[in-house]
Amino acid sequence: GSLAEARSKCYEALAQSGDAVVRSEAESLLGLINMELLFSPAPMPEKEEYAVQAGDSLDRIARKFKTTVDLIAKGNLLKSDVIRPGDRLRVFKGVFAIAVSKAGNDLVLSADGKFIKRYRVGTGQFGKTPAGTFVIVDKIVDPPWWRPDGKVIPFGDKENVLGTRWMSIAAVEGTEHAAGYGIHGTWEDDTIGKQASAGCIRMHNADVEELFILVPAGTRVTITE
């Protein structure tokens, strides 16, 4: 229960303190604690006990709870996709949302309005990353990169700039349509925390791999100046 207690104390600090240092430390600690809880069978208020039914698959359970197969598997330490009726799983039932600040070059992951973790990101040079409300559409592991001239650069090619994961985003709710934008990894870690990309949101590969496990397609992404 000590992780849960530490988590509660950190949320109290965030709710009560206006001190930037205290808030930053609480956020850092929460990022670590939340990942520890999400990626293990440890209980948390945002998880539900679920008994596997006849005919269930991880994909079906993931759709039912609007989560990802990866998170169910990792959170229950499953060695394979094979599940049997009567197996008990702890399944995350919260709704993730992503908020990207262009000025701050950071990305905040929340669940049901609660802070989960803050990541450093790189955004578009000259303010090229569009602001507005989006949702994640496609999620691709080891993505190929479509160069601006239309040539496809396969994953593993030195010229492919997308890193290890790609999540495309589409505009919703009156945000102007902007094609070709997304959240991806990078091979150039020194560009994180800067406005250096062609407009996409880039993350350290380890960070985008973590986020990729957590957020399903349909997750809202809000980008602010």
Predicted ranges, named:
Residues L3-A4, L37-K66:
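Primarily a LysM-type cell-wall glycan-binding module
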Residues E12, K47-A51, S57-I61, R120-T123, ...:
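Second-shell loop/turn segments in exported
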Residues E12-P45, V69-S101, T224-E225:
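Extracellular LysM carbohydrate-binding repeats and other cell-envelope/extracellular binding modules
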Residues G55, G86-L89, G218-T219:
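Loop/turn positions that initiate beta-strands
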Residues K93-W187:
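Gly/Pro-biased beta-strand-loop elements
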Residues D207-E225:
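N-terminal targeting pre-sequences for secretion and organelle import
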